[in-house]
């Protein structure tokens, strides 16, 4: 299996399976001298960690990260950073009854078609459990971007099923299990998820990510456009079926006079482009949005086939998230951070001596909500 590495200068390679002994990753290309300890990484891992509320999977993984290399006396050395998280709450017996069945909506069918075998225990490598290492690596990128360049990356739940956030308060996001910015929607979300759990069904969600303080000039103008790499990274998250940058698909109904972002000496007057023009950052907030499908692991029966291609019925009895979007906010933040970190280092390597004659102008003040 190839395709386990992201990035060109700041690279992240992950390994491990849902029910294996551990998950791990190698972060290469981190500049030396960054103060780093396990606590710096654990903060984001705890935000993603399963089993924290009744609305997520009850698999209880502490996700305690270990730094194996690349840090000496509390600072990065510039050598590869090895990270490890042990799996401690696997319950593989939950999957014994379905090991011969192909779960609809999962990677069972495609893995068997591609590799001729699959790890039926929780999906193996295709499980969202793998994203723990993305969050761990992303925490390093977020710390560097914030401390060295003033870049802040935050996300929130914009919509869960039919429930949309209508008010916006960053202070509320970290104070509820949904990462929802609208205090008036929390009780509605809780009631909706309680009813959904009783039904045994699942639901999709939308997560928005905002990166502020991104300098202009990041991104390459053709195949490695900043927005293209962001879309690639965000689309690689399990269950993501759609990505938007800026207003995204709403641009279809906008006229050019509505969509273009006017410039004045005092700053931009809008940010429909989401902080990227021509594949290069403008200095405005980077705005990205992802749509996550409802999980297909349900205790409701569904038609399928078995490993011999015969008709069968499947009921999944393992522990699963009824809405994967509830825990996706720190994952989306991490993927955005990894892309921005990589492009910042690439820009510095090629363009550090460039002195633009054109002055930078301020970002549109309403571009991050």
UniProtKB/Swiss-Prot annotation:
UniProt-annotated binding residues for FMN: 125-127, 238-239, 278, 293-297, 319
Amino-acid biosynthesis among keywords: yes
Pathway linked to the protein: Metabolic intermediate biosynthesis; chorismate biosynthesis; chorismate from D-erythrose 4-phosphate and phosphoenolpyruvate: step 7/7
GO molecular function: chorismate synthase activity; FMN binding
The EC number(s) this enzyme carries: 4.2.3.5
UniProt GO BP: amino acid biosynthetic process; aromatic amino acid family biosynthetic process; chorismate biosynthetic process
Pfam family for this entry, one: Chorismate_synt
GO cellular component, one term: cytosol
Gene3D superfamilies linked: Chorismate synthase AroC
Top EC class for this record: lyase
Record's function text: This reaction introduces a second double bond into the aromatic ring system.
Family stated for the protein in its record: Belongs to the chorismate synthase family.
Subunit structure: Homotetramer.
Protein name: Chorismate synthase
Species for this entry: Nitrosococcus oceani (strain ATCC 19707 / BCRC 17464 / JCM 30415 / NCIMB 11848 / C-107)
